[in-house]
Amino acid sequence: MNHFINLLVAEGFVRTNEPLTDQLVVHSVAGSGKSTLIRKFLEEQPLARAYTHCRADPPNLEGRFIQPFKGPCPDHFNILDEYCKEPISAKFQVLIADPLQYRTQHLRPHYVNHKSHRLGPETCKLLSSLGIKVESHRRDRDVVTLSGIFGSPILGQAIALDRSASDLLRAHGIQALCPIESIGQEYPVVTVVSSEPLRNVRFKDQVYIALSRHTEQLHVLSPEFPHTTSRPQ
């Protein structure tokens, strides 16, 4: 456990005041590097095993990769990624997740990380304006444009925040993902479409997921932005 905690601290995770137990709970935002941290731990610890409820790694020759979910391996150090997605059914040494992606009740964490290496400052400003705390750890600036729902073309991967937006896109020959379908995915360019103002969307986890899938450019089409505004790189 000490080795894993040392990795957390080295990667910028911050200790909370929650008393430590024999099961470590770690929370972090999108792009914080938690998957990279898990992979590094697997490389350094032969008895470590990691499983996820989301997108697993492709197998490798060494057998050290994040595997699809199954029960913990006896006599090993077991990590469960995205534990919030399903009820916890077994004992893992580490539970780790981005709880902002889920509506389910989560445990109180021992370590947290609000800093994202993937999301740029403009994206984080937009998320902050919606009451979602994410800090950018990128040195370069990202591109975010805000337009009315008919104010800009669809660029990159489309994500629809509601049924009306999805139906509208489909009518124009565009097959959009819903936020849940995009969990664990990354795209260079994303266009998020909402038929209502982002502040009015009932489930904030859906907004957070949709606005955090891009690596380079985010384009938001919503009726609250009648005139296109651009925050260039």
UniProtKB/Swiss-Prot annotation:
<keyword id="KW-0941">Suppressor of RNA silencing</keyword>
<feature type="domain" description="(+)RNA virus helicase C-terminal">
    <location>
        <begin position="134"/>
        <end position="233"/>
    </location>
</feature>
<dbReference type="Pfam" id="PF01443">
    <property type="entry name" value="Viral_helicase1"/>
</dbReference>
<comment type="similarity">
    <text>Belongs to the Tymovirales TGBp1 protein family.</text>
</comment>
<dbReference type="GO" id="GO:0003723">
    <property type="term" value="F:RNA binding"/>
</dbReference>
<dbReference type="GO" id="GO:0052170">
    <property type="term" value="P:symbiont-mediated suppression of host innate immune response"/>
</dbReference>
<protein>
    <recommendedName>
        <fullName>Movement and silencing protein TGBp1</fullName>
    </recommendedName>
</protein>
<dbReference type="GO" id="GO:0005524">
    <property type="term" value="F:ATP binding"/>
</dbReference>
<keyword id="KW-0945">Host-virus interaction</keyword>
<keyword id="KW-1035">Host cytoplasm</keyword>
<feature type="domain" description="(+)RNA virus helicase ATP-binding">
    <location>
        <begin position="1"/>
        <end position="133"/>
    </location>
</feature>
<keyword id="KW-0899">Viral immunoevasion</keyword>
<comment type="function">
    <text>Transports viral genome to neighboring plant cells directly through plasmosdesmata, without any budding. The movement protein allows efficient cell to cell propagation, by bypassing the host cell wall barrier. Increases plasmodesma size exclusion limit. Acts as a suppressor of RNA-mediated gene silencing, also known as post-transcriptional gene silencing (PTGS), a mechanism of plant viral defense that limits the accumulation of viral RNAs.</text>
</comment>
<dbReference type="GO" id="GO:0046740">
    <property type="term" value="P:transport of virus in host, cell to cell"/>
</dbReference>
<keyword id="KW-0916">Viral movement protein</keyword>
<dbReference type="InterPro" id="IPR027351">
    <property type="entry name" value="(+)RNA_virus_helicase_core_dom"/>
</dbReference>
<dbReference type="GO" id="GO:0030430">
    <property type="term" value="C:host cell cytoplasm"/>
</dbReference>
<keyword id="KW-0813">Transport</keyword>
<keyword id="KW-1090">Inhibition of host innate immune response by virus</keyword>
<keyword id="KW-0694">RNA-binding</keyword>
<comment type="subunit">
    <text>Homodimer and homooligomer. Interacts with capsid protein. Interacts with host AGO1; this interaction targets the host protein for degradation, thereby suppressing the antiviral RNA silencing.</text>
</comment>
